[in-house]
UniProtKB/Swiss-Prot annotation:
Signal peptide: none annotated. It holds the Pfam family MethyltransfD12. This is Type II methyltransferase M.MjaIII. Gene3D superfamilies: Adenine-specific Methyltransferase, Domain 2, Vaccinia Virus protein VP39. It comes from the Archaea.
């Protein structure tokens, strides 16, 4: 079974999986890594790739985005009911004409924002996935109040979900521990037999390229510095570490001095100027091996 991400997600790693594979620690390929830990799991491209290819005794994932982590939890524990909810959203949406589809989208978005705390979890996740597949460019963006505020996307025939893929994801997540919080939440799980992959919100290369508003918590330079300190702390523990970030050589060269810093080419799928969706851009991979 081939498992693919079930959400569109900013900074998704599908485009650089081959470079990530080339740079994985040899201990992983030799079967000496027992634990995989990913504190910025996002859309899960790296997680799904590694879980299909390598054996781990323990897998721990986390992200600060509560709705995202609820998604993983529901897909893992209640996939059949989720598929029912999604089917009903999809069928109603696809039966409407364009103008009514737009109205339906905003109705679901309002429900999603209003019922944050007292909505049934499965229903909420179905709304989350529906919005992700029908909103503009598949973005996830919230305002400071934490309200999802992306406009309608006007796709002709959006594929809201892939039933078989969701079931496969559910199987793959069976033994995965799902956390939610700041990246330091994984600290207690990391030991010398761990491989940790960090994929934080990228430091913007310029003012317009910033896309870190997928939580109401900004990830700024202070957070990048805090993350680098955490990276050094885990390095001393003997864990194998890999981190992705933007091609900002001056900033990261100083921050991760002494580590193995490589330049890789990524193709970006989410970009507001639709015609530039597949530009190749450089990124950094930073490893402690």
């Amino acid at each position: 079974m081939e498992v693919k991400p079930f959400l569109k997600w900013a900074g998704g790693k599908t485009q650089i999986l081959s470079q990530i594979e080339e740079n994985l620690p040899k201990e992983l390929k030799e079967g000496n890594i027992k634990k995989y830990i990913e504190p910025f799991v996002g859309g899960g491209a790296v997680l799904f790739y590694l879980l299909q290819k390598y054996e781990f005794k323990k897998v721990i994932i986390s992200d600060i985005n509560e709705d995202l982590m609820l998604c993983y939890k529901v897909v893992k524990n209640d996939v059949d009911r989720l598929i029912e909810e999604l089917s009903s959203l999809r069928d109603e949406f696809l039966s409407l004409d364009e103008e009514k589809r737009k109205e339906f989208y905003y109705k679901v978005r309002d429900d999603f924002n209003k019922n944050k705390n007292d909505c049934d979890e499965v229903k909420r996740v179905a709304q989350f996935i529906f919005l992700n597949k029908t909103c503009y460019n598949g973005l996830y963006r919230v305002n400071k109040k934490g309200e999802f505020n992306v406009p309608y996307g006007r796709y002709k025939n959006p594929k809201i979900f892939d039933e078989q893929n969701l079931k496969n994801v559910s199987k793959l997540l069976k033994n995965v521990k799902i956390l939610c919080g700041d990246f330091e939440i994984v600290d207690e799980y990391v030991d010398a037999e761990s491989f940790v992959y960090f994929d934080p919100p990228y430091k913007p290369l310029n003012k317009t390229s910033s896309f870190t508003s997928y939580t109401k918590y900004d990830f700024n330079d202070d957070d990048q510095i805090r993350l680098a300190k955490f990276y050094r702390k885990l390095d001393k523990r003997g864990a194998k570490l890999m981190l992705s970030n933007s091609y900002n050589v001056d900033f990261f060269g100083k921050l991760y001095e002494g580590f193995n810093i490589k330049k890789v080419v990524a193709k970006r799928m989410i970009n507001c100027k639709g015609d530039k969706r597949k530009d190749g851009i450089y990124e950094l991979l930073i490893m402690n091996y």
